[in-house]
Amino acid sequence: MTIDTQAQEYFSKHRRIWEQKPVLRRIYEEELFARLLSSKTPGGISIEIGGGPGFFKKLFPEVISTDLISCPWLDVVADAQALPFQTSTVTNVLGLDVLHHLAAPMKFLQEAERILVPGGRLVLVEPWITPFSRIIYRYFHQEDCDLSAQPWKLEDPGIAHGKKAFDGNQAIPYLLFGAGNRQKTLAALPSFQCIKAEPFCLFAYLLSFGFKPMSLLPEMFYPGVSRLERLSLPLWRRFAALRVLLALEKSRDPRVAKETDSGGAAPLQR
């Protein structure tokens, strides 16, 4: 089975479940996508990395949606680790569940730093490691949760060799941006400052079972569960949150910004 065929089947399955589970749509649109949109810089050009099944594009149609695989609902076929956009031309780089799937996540972060305009933002929603989420991800999720990985290496043989397109290590975002490692990561990204690292997400997503066919959360109960989750967030975010909102802003000081370009990149068109 080719990677394109595998991807089409994967996306088709997700699109089918998306249509069948209104509570899942509400969680994504009112929690995950809403956090991405509320944290971006207004105006300008926004691109989505890992557009996949096209759910975010439906909510935010002006975004330039990209993925490694060609799909009718996506705008650009692009490798997140070698983006085909000119330096300092993009206002926002947005992504949901992308960073932990990449073979060389630091290459992507450097590419985002390169293509963003001064004041532009990289905004991501990713898995996050807490004492509770580590149990969930390690024992109840199909993707790896390997805290021994070294994501700062631009070419990590332990990650890159033999990696399939949909393989993931849900520990990667925490390893890069957890409090103990954040400065190490930012030292390799001199134009970036981390303006948000906000853990969230618990009850509603767990009860919905995500992209599995079953759900323990009827849509009619979602508003109450969502309200409870928001009100109680300060009590559990440090030890039980499943996800994190990350926002990195590129410095407006031209003396800080890198002057690198990938050469041959085409200018963006609205």
What is each of the regions a protein language model found here?
Residues 164-181:
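Acceptor-substrate binding/catalytic loop of class I
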Residues 122-161:
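Conserved class I S-adenosyl-L-methionine
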Residues 97-98:
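Short catalytic micro-motifs in class I SAM-dependent methyltransferases
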Residues 82-87:
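Short conserved loop adjoining the S-adenosyl-L-methionine
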Residues 106-118:
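A short glycine-rich, Lys/Arg-flanked "PGG" loop and its adjoining helix->strand segment in the class I
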Residues 94:
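A conserved beta-strand element that flanks and buttresses the S-adenosyl-L-methionine
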Residues 183, 187-190, 194-270:
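A C-terminal cap/extension of S-adenosyl-L-methionine-dependent methyltransferases
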Residues 1-81, 242, 254-270:
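Conserved N-terminal segment of class I S-adenosyl-L-methionine
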